[in-house]
């Protein structure tokens, strides 16, 4: 569905008027267009399932969800623009409205998540660490990429397990709960004889909490580690959050089941 600036302006207007129960005539007057123009827009919205009834300015669940997502991003970008410039409220709003439409979805999402992280870092500016459960409460819902490296236990050497996952990983925050998500990928391993390339992938992942290894949940072949009992350390100078957790990884490479090995998963969020 293509969203133009004009179309989004109508959706935002209807969203703000949702509790007024105004007639189409009154809505058109408030918006500053003729009744016929407003009715044509409503007719278009009805065919796109954005309003619940033909000729009524009441957003459907789909329309409200779409509008709220844009409004949330506009609000964040507006606040950011005001913090870095001398824009008035109205100027910042219109610039933010333009930005959410001209940016690609990927760039827009990255900008918004970066702004969310900026707000988090401002909140924890005077602390050296934050628990995972508090991190999940203070960080807006979303999916945040994180860099990670898996090291051999008690060594500054990168573990073979590091190649068993897609980089970066994802920290997913949803309704005050947070999970680290690791995406396994195909591993290539040269046989001891050196003439055969064996292929496979991570078969199981365990993580240590309170000196006990716990099986990671596997959802759609992705490994999930809850963050609620992890401790994140904050570096103010570099604006990064970092945590480490011991893990056990077992890989299935061809006909060979490689033994379960211990390693350290080091995570950086910036």
Regions found by a protein language model. Name each.
Residues 19-30:
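Short acidic, hydrophobic short linear motifs in intrinsically disordered regions
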Residues 27, 37-48:
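Basic amphipathic alpha-helical segments that dock to polyanions
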Residues 46-56:
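A short, conserved structural fragment
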Residues 55-73:
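Basic, amphipathic "hinge/linker" alpha-helix immediately C-terminal to the N-terminal HTH DNA-binding motif
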Residues 1-10:
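Short alpha-helical segments that sit at the start of domains
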Residues 132-179, 183-270:
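N-terminal soluble domains immediately following signal/targeting peptides that reside
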Residues 9, 13-17:
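Short amphipathic alpha-helical elements of helix-turn-helix/winged-helix folds
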Residues 75-116:
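Amphipathic alpha-helical dimerization/coiled-coil segments
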């Amino acid at each position: 569905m293509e969203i133009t600036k004009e179309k989004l302006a109508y959706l935002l207007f209807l969203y703000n008027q949702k509790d007024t129960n105004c007639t189409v005539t009154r809505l058109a007057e408030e918006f500053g267009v003729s009744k016929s123009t407003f009715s044509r827009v409503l007719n278009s919205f009805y065919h796109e399932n954005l309003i619940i009834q033909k000729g009524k300015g009441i957003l459907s669940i789909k329309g409200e969800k779409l509008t709220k997502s844009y409004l949330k991003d506009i609000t964040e970008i507006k606040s950011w623009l005001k913090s870095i410039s001398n824009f008035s409220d109205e100027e910042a709003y219109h610039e933010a409205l333009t930005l959410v439409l001209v940016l690609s979805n990927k760039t827009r999402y990255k900008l918004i998540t970066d702004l969310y992280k900026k707000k988090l870092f401002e909140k924890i500016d005077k602390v050296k660490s934050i628990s995972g459960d508090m991190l999940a409460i203070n960080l807006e819902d979303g999916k945040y990429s994180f860099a990670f490296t898996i090291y051999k236990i008690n060594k500054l050497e990168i573990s073979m397990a590091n190649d068993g996952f897609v980089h970066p990983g994802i920290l997913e925050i949803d309704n005050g709960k947070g999970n680290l998500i690791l995406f396994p990928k195909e591993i290539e391993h040269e046989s001891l004889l050196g003439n055969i390339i064996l292929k496979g992938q991570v078969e199981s992942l365990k993580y240590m909490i309170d000196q006990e290894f716990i099986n990671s949940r596997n959802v759609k072949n992705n490994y999930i580690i809850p963050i609620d009992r992890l401790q994140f350390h904050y570096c103010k100078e570099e604006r990064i959050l970092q945590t480490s957790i011991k893990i056990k990884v077992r890989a299935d490479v061809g006909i060979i089941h490689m033994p379960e090995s211990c390693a350290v998963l080091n995570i950086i969020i910036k």
